[in-house]
Every structure is written in structure tokens, then in C-alpha cells.
Amino acid sequence: MAPKDFFPPAPLDLDWDNIGIKVREVNGHVECAYNVATESWSEPQVVKGIDLTISGLSPALNYGQQAYEGMKAFRDPQGQIHIFRPEVHAARMAHSCEVVSIPPIPQAQFIRSVALAVSVNAEFVPPFDSSAALYIRPLAFGSGPQINLAQPEEYTFCVFVLPVTSLLGTKPVDALIMEEFDRTAPMGSGNAKVGGNYAPVLRWAAKARARGYGIPLHLDSKTRTEIDEFSAAGFIGVRDDDGKTTIVVPDSSCIIQSVTSDSCVQLARSYGWSVEVRPIKYTELPEFSEVLAVGTAAVIVPIGSITRDSLRDLIVYKPSEDGGYPCADKLFKSIKDIQRGLGKDVFNWCVPVHEPGAYFQPVSA
């Protein structure tokens, strides 16, 4: 049986374009446990629901020993389901785990666990012609009880899934530079996807939203002169050099390696655009014709303006005559077409998902 024949179709009674990011019940999630004695992760198991049982004295809850990822699965016009760039997410999560002293999940096991979670929840993968996707949340944490600041005896790796629409939508948003709060320290953990980099941003993001700004933008914490990233997305600047397009991506040890940004870089080169990966000075912002917020949740969102209160700066990025942002629109369409099977996957970014039985290892006698 072909994978597309195994998977049930997406339910037609759901308004897929307006499901938002509300947490809802699905068929279950996947769990693996780490064995300290054998220094290995257990085989993935499907667990019903989305709840976990965890010690109140786990280092995950007490010391923030956790790392996570964000990725997506899609359905193509033929009904096949696939995951977008899982190997890159596996590598990034392995790095994040090392930063917070969690045993890294081997790439093969990471991808197998993610694919299993998608497979058992196949009916929650939206139709290919909707604006929604199946969001995937791999999570690893120290789970064994441990009151002192030391390595626990137990670790858990889980994969949860949830159908969602885009976090920020597709219309341009206004950004506010954070000046009262630094997201990370110069030699800190800013290049890891760990909760400690995001929870402190919540109140500042809420304050920005209350003032009408859709997303905070962070400068480097050492000099406040260079662009790091948005609070929940990577930064890309677009420069028009006499008709020649150049995209500029920050090179900083304090930001995560954005999978969407990397996808944009590869696409840009395939278009014949120039690509610069280097530190970006704050003073360069007015030189850009477009600024993009890019990420798994946001995909690609054009920035309408950037405000810096201390300097009373307001940098506006005007749309073209037709109301669009040409580079953002081109990159967005290319990525979405590949993700949904509407365009040729020339980079081999999409990994097909099979029936659940394909992801369980046979038990030896």
C-alpha cells in the first residue's frame, strides 16, 4: 500500500484556513527515554493524549534543562505527507541539547520519532490547498528528580503535533527594537533553541503589542550596534543595488541557525541573487528595500517599519505599487510551493512519511 493510500484525508468539516494556533487534542504523541547505563535512547513509543507525567523536582522544571524544535509537515495534491527539512532540525536540536547538557538525540532516531508522531496523527495534516500545516514540536528535557544542580538519571524526548495556521499571518508587521532587555549574553546560550531564551521575552513582547508593534527586534547585547534577530524569527535584509538583489543575513554567535533563513539563502542563490552572511550594523537598516522576519512559525513576513525609541528613529519599508514586497513574495511562494508539492523539490528538502509500522524497530528474539 502506498503511503498516500494509507493516510486518511484531512477532515472537510474543519475551517483549515482559520484554525489559528489553538492547542487541540490529537491522537497522541511520541516518547523516548534515555538510559544512563547504556547511554542510549529507547525506541519511540506512541502515548495517547498530550499530557506528561514528570517529577516536580526534575531539572527541566527547576533549572530549565530543556531544548526544543519547531518544524512542519504538509500534504501534497496526491495525498502524500512529508516533513520539511527534518535533518537540519535534528542537527540544530542536537546542538541545543549539548548546550543544556542533555544527551543529544541521534539524527536517525530524531527523524524516525518525528515521522512516527506525524504518521499516527495523519488526519490532522491539513489539505494541501489550505494555508495551514501540521506543526511539530520535538522536546527534550531532564526528567529524573534531582534537587542539586547536577546531571539527572533520566531524560525524556517527546514529539507533539498540532495543526496550525501561520503565527504572524502574511501582512506586513511593525517591529520595535528592544532596548530595556537583552535576549542573550555575548557568550551565552543564544544560539540554542531553549526555553530560557524565550520566556523572559514574553512580557516585553506583550508591551510591544500593546503599543501596536507585532514583533520585537533584538540588537547585540554587547554594543547595541548590530542586528541579532526578532524575538520569534530570524532577520533578513534585502538590498536593491541598481537592479541587483542582495539579501543580507546576520552572522552572530548569539542567534539560532534559522532553517527558514537557510532555505531563503539557498533559494536566493538559485535566483542569481547575491547573498551576504555577516554582522549587520543598525545604521544599515535604512539601506534595505525590504526586511523579512523568517521562521518555521512565521514562514516569511515582511516588516512594515522598525522603531527605535531612544533615537526617535522610524524606518519605513514601503510596499511596491501593487501593495506587495517583491522579494518576500517570491521567497514565500517558492518555499510554500515546495512544502505543498506544487513546485519541484530541487533541494530535496521534503522527506515522505510512511505508515506507523515503518518506524518501529523489530524486537530481537
Curated annotation (Swiss-Prot):
One of its GO terms (molecular function) is branched-chain-amino-acid transaminase activity. It comes from the Eukaryota. The keyword Flavoprotein does not apply. It holds the Pfam family Aminotran_4. GO terms for biological process: branched-chain amino acid metabolic process. InterPro entries: Aminotrans_IV, Aminotransferase-like, B_amino_transII, BCAT-like_C, BCAT-like_N, BCAT_family. Induction: Expression is positively regulated by the oxaleimides biosynthesis cluster-specific transcription factor poxB. The modification N6-(pyridoxal phosphate)lysine is found at residue 193. Pyridoxal 5'-phosphate binds at residues 92, 229. Pathway: Secondary metabolite biosynthesis. Its cofactor is pyridoxal 5'-phosphate. Keywords: Aminotransferase, Pyridoxal phosphate, Transferase. Its EC number is 2.6.1.-. Aminotransferase; part of the gene cluster that mediates the biosynthesis of oxaleimides, cytotoxic compounds containing an unusual disubstituted succinimide moiety. The first step of the pathway is provided by the HR-PKS poxF that serves in a new mode of collaborative biosynthesis with the PKS-NRPS poxE, by providing the olefin containing amino acid substrate via the synthesis of an ACP-bound dec-4-enoate. Belongs to the class-IV pyridoxal-phosphate-dependent aminotransferase family. This is Aminotransferase poxL. The gene is poxL.
